[in-house]
Swiss-Prot record:
PANTHER family: ANTI-SILENCING PROTEIN 1 (PTHR12040), HISTONE CHAPERONE ASF1 (PTHR12040:SF0)
Gene designation per UniProt: ASF1
Function per UniProt: Histone chaperone that facilitates histone deposition and histone exchange and removal during nucleosome assembly and disassembly.
Keywords, comma-separated and alphabetical: Chaperone, Chromatin regulator, Nucleus, Transcription, Transcription regulation
GO CC terms, sorted: chromosome, telomeric region; cytosol; H3 histone acetyltransferase complex; nucleus
Gene Ontology BP terms: cellular response to stress; DNA replication-dependent chromatin assembly; nucleosome assembly; nucleosome disassembly; positive regulation of transcription elongation by RNA polymerase II; protein modification process; silent mating-type cassette heterochromatin formation; subtelomeric heterochromatin formation
Name of the protein described by the UniProt record: Histone chaperone ASF1
Record GO terms (molecular function): acetyltransferase activator activity; histone binding
Subunit architecture: Interacts with histone H3 and histone H4.
Biased composition (Basic and acidic residues): 192-203, 261-276
Region (Disordered) residue spans: 159-276
Composition bias, Basic residues: 181-191
Biased composition (Low complexity): 162-176
Length: 276
């Protein structure tokens, strides 16, 4: 069972200029007290041919996390166009919103993004050198691809032998610390009370409920050595291949793109969250 369940992601500024910040209103539920913060990241896939062009746009530490339903706004800078191949600046790509606990990623949300010129003239005859100021991005917000990973939320206590604490601490910092310290934010909760049925699926906002039954939750015996399992096993290339542009408003994804997210186990009181 996942201690943290992603309930909804709302893309606030969409469509927007290519140079505008990304803004996401994220709602999640925490079932048990957490000792550490949640780390959220947004990654821009600059090329379908190589992950060398992936850009981490921003990361944010959210905590301490109270038990209940929490909400906050995640902002991230636009990608650096100098790090994107010139022939892949326009067209369809992917952004990945991920969340990790103690260095272990447990949920990933992929969105298709269509980058195109705002005017028909530029779309018909694009300049040899792309004019970034005139490019519009459109995130296909109602068709997220959600991948969940089963992780070990409560790891055994570290070795308390007097000869090993320094070594253990050093290895932990080396393997989990980000290159630069992300920003930190405290989520806020609502004071409103209400109950939901415990057997009702929690869906991503803007996604219709699937016809199939059951959940894509990995069993503990499927855990890999690092404690994670890729439930869907889909690559970024596969995400791109399934996208079909049908009009100038950003297109639509292939059938079956909508994915359900974690189902809350117990009955809880719903709380509105605010951001400090």
């Amino acid at each position: 069972m996942s201690v943290v369940s992603l309930l909804g992601v709302n893309v606030i500024n969409n469509p927007a200029k290519f140079t505008d910040k990304y803004e996401f209103e994220i709602t999640f539920e925490c079932l048990e007290p957490l000792q550490k913060d949640l780390e959220w990241k947004l990654t821009y896939v600059g090329s379908a041919q190589s992950d060398n062009y992936d850009q981490e746009l921003d990361s944010l530490l959210v905590g301490p996390i109270p038990v209940g339903i929490n909400k906050f706004v995640f902002e991230a800078d636009p990608p650096d166009t100098k790090r994107i191949p010139i022939d892949e600046l326009l067209g369809v790509t992917v952004i990945l919103l991920t969340c990790a606990y103690d260095g272990r990623e447990f949920v990933r949300v992929g969105y298709y993004v269509n980058n195109e010129y705002e005017s028909d003239e530029l779309r018909d005859e694009p300049p040899a050198k792309p004019d970034v100021e005139k490019i519009r991005r459109n995130v296909l917000a109602n068709k997220p691809r959600v991948t969940r990973f089963a992780i070990k939320w409560l790891l055994p206590a570290p070795n308390s032998h007097p000869s090993s604490p320094r070594l253990t601490s050093s290895l932990t910092r080396t393997s989990t610390a980000p290159k630069s310290l992300p920003k930190r934010r405290r989520p806020r909760q609502s004071r409103a009370h209400g109950e939901e049925s415990a057997d009702k699926d929690a869906q991503m906002e803007g996604v219709e409920g699937p016809d199939g039954e059951g959940e894509n939750v990995a069993e503990d015996d499927e855990l890999s050595d690092d404690g994670s399992v890729d439930i869907e096993g889909e690559s970024e290339d596969e995400l791109l291949e399934e996208y079909e542009v049908v009009d100038q408003e950003g297109g639509e994804a292939a059938e079956g793109d909508e994915m359900e997210v974690d189902k809350p186990e117990p009955t809880v009181h719903k709380q509105e969250a605010m951001v400090h």
